[in-house]
Amino acid sequence: MQPPLFKIRQHGYFGFINSEGKTVIEPQYLEAGEFRNGFTTVRLNGLLALMDALGRLYIKRLYRAVGPFSEGLARVQVAQLWGFVDERGNEVIAPLFEHVGDFCEGLAPATFEGRAGFIRPDGQFSVQPVFSQTGNFSEGLAPAGHDGLWGFVDKTGAYHIAPQWDGASTFQEQSALVTRDGHWGLCNRAGEETVPPQFEFVKGHAQGEFFDGMALAFRAGKYGFVSQDGRVAVEPMFDLAGDFGGGLALVEINGAYGYIDREGKLAIMPKFEDAGVFSDGLAQVCADGRWGYINPDGQIAIPPAFQSAAPFRDGLALTVLDGKWQYINLRGEVVWRES
């Protein structure tokens, strides 16, 4: 597994440091993505090039869009069509498809001439394109739409769960999001609706996506949570809520922000002007216009001093002080600062 790298900014250019704050890739790019699975993208002449953790560019061809590597392959877009490259930058599946997803369990959803199926790593269809749209496999099942209705197919392309919903998403362990009449709920792997569609779609939210085993749910103007085992764990009652992390989730009550536990009980009283998700044991909070970090007991771990603060990731967090980027560690020590 590749050690984590963190994006830095210097004089308007982007590069990367390691967790000790040492520069690994010098700031030299006007645009750079985040590293995922050992690779990122940088923009060259208006198009994207792959770059590995050593700073090596794979420029056999530049692309309009590049997806993350999954099972050794990354989707890439040339003009309007998609194909795949391997971890050496070789184009192993030619850009022939109108749409593709990531490889999961040896197959990737792919659309060819308006119909969707599943391809193997050699680019050939394992499940012929007979569907209107398809999603990723998870433990042997994938969402697939046909004649306006969605169900779930196995790796032979046969429906394991009959088409019956207006939409469906990839299973996350035992639950998958399904939609009917503009609302979403959950079904299990037997096709039973464990949470009948009742929640509204909210722009900017990851509908039905589980974090720490819980997913945000919005109904009648209030936020609650559904659990990954297929139940409404916290009835919608909050003006605003954020994703779970470390067993706690941000909620807004009467204009102030605090945190609840998995049962919906207040664990940290609402007293902050703004707040974020718990990660690496700390969450960013805003008090008197400045950002700092608290621990799960609600105690200040890093005093509010920053103009902005991001969640911790792999032991570091990006903060802004006096308009400059800087990374701090879990003790609040600055390991790198923009000059």
Residue ranges and their predicted role:
Residues 1-339:
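Residue-level detector of conserved, function-critical positions
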